[in-house]
Amino acid sequence: MDDADLRERLEQRLMSHGVYVTDLSTDDGTLHVAYETASPGDGVPHREVGRVLNRLLALLDEGWEPLDVRAEVSSIEEDLRGAWRADAEWLAAHDRGDLSDVDLSQRVIDTIEEA
């Protein structure tokens, strides 16, 4: 699955939730995703982190190979709100059933860096 296909598949599911992918690229084994959130307030909305993460997990069934994920979150006014990450190892462990939904979510939430 190339970057254009991956971006399209992410956008299809996320736009209805107020998450707008603004940039997506793969570089040296890392998926970089930038998106804007329509959610009010400051910081990184945890619910939207979950939505992006769940969509990536669903794409594993469609042939996407897990990569380290680095995400940057901005407001629709383009103000940086923060960043988060998910390691490829965590995604693969979840896919194998070795890491629960709760444990994966907690690991990712723990990586959030507010702007």
Model-derived regions, located:
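Acidic, polar-rich N-terminal leader regions of halophilic archaeal proteins
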Residues: 1-115
